[in-house]
Amino acid sequence: MKLTDNEEITMNGTREMETTEQETSSPCSLVIEAFPVKKSIIVGYALTSKKIKSFLQPKLEGLARNKGILFVAIDQNKPLSEQGPFDIVLHKQIGKEWRRILEEFRLAHPDVTVLDPPDAILHLRNRQSMLQCVADMNLSDSNGRVGVPKQLVIKKDASSIPEAVNNAGLRLPLVAKPLVADGSAKSHELSLAYDQHSLLKLEPPLVLQEFVNHGGVLFKVYIVGEAIRVVRRFSLPDVSRRELPKSAGVFRFPRVSCAAASADDADLDPSIAELPPRPLLERLAKELRRGLGLRLFNLDIIREHGTRDRFYVIDINYFPGYGKMPEYEHVFTDFLLSVVQSQCKKRALADQY
């Protein structure tokens, strides 16, 4: 199978919901008649300038307007309670003060959906706890098994790393990632350490993961509510056990999905290029939505080379770069409509009692 480093593959190659502009001129057409919504859905957003540029693209805003959705910037210099009214608050900001403000707003405005709860997002900012939900799940069925690579947390003192690695029984090479995953460029950096001496060059706090050969391909699994899309990306190349003794040093990469971008075109074995089974991804996504309390995130998944059904989750990111996801505009606007539909149902049911 031919794959360029820019190729993107969706699970089914098509949108799950095909709607024309005429059909979606009012969001009421996508909501059950028994639970009508108002004509305009107001989505307040608090995003970084980088996220605004990549996410709030003209095509998204145009499609959203056609569906009755308006994006309104939140002024973080003014009290949040004095802005709006909002149906949904969409955010990706960090800091204790912002979390406090948002939590107070959630309690005072239970009818507004905050995507996503700040405390739940915080769970993904630490790579020590990030993958614990997957590890605890121990997901295994007829479609495959999903786990996490063996890993070790080093909070300080690089001189202690070789001994800690030996005590933990980790095998070289090891992937080193910053402990804090705050969305910054630095938090996406990774290093590949081939030998004991190179471990001393690493900079704690960090997480060390055993490197799993995976054919140089990873799968980015985007979750938007209940929707799932998969994009195939190049990754770090496999490491031969036979060649390992000849390798030494630390190799640094800006992020794993860019690590092998220089590979240009590659002819991939179908067993490497094949997407993970959809039923397995649906079950994994469902369990993670419940376990993490999040609806907007993505997973970096690899398949162990030489197997068909052994998968590892190596990273989870909140509110990732959806602009890189095929047809994200349709997926995301349909998701926002479903959120408001759920709000309307709850209000209608509450009014009956």
UniProtKB/Swiss-Prot annotation:
**Gene name of this polypeptide:** ITPK3
Q: GO terms for biological process?
A: inositol trisphosphate metabolic process; response to wounding
> Keywords on this record?
ATP-binding, Kinase, Magnesium, Metal-binding, Nucleotide-binding, Transferase
Detail which positions bind ATP.
Answer: 127, 177, 209-220, 235
Can you give the residue ranges of the ATP-grasp domain?
A: 138-350
Protein known as: Inositol-tetrakisphosphate 1-kinase 3
Subunit structure and binding partners:
Monomer.
Q: In which tissues is it expressed?
A: Highly expressed in leaves and flowers, and at lower levels in roots, stems, cauline leaves and siliques.
* Cofactor comment: Binds 2 magnesium ions per subunit.
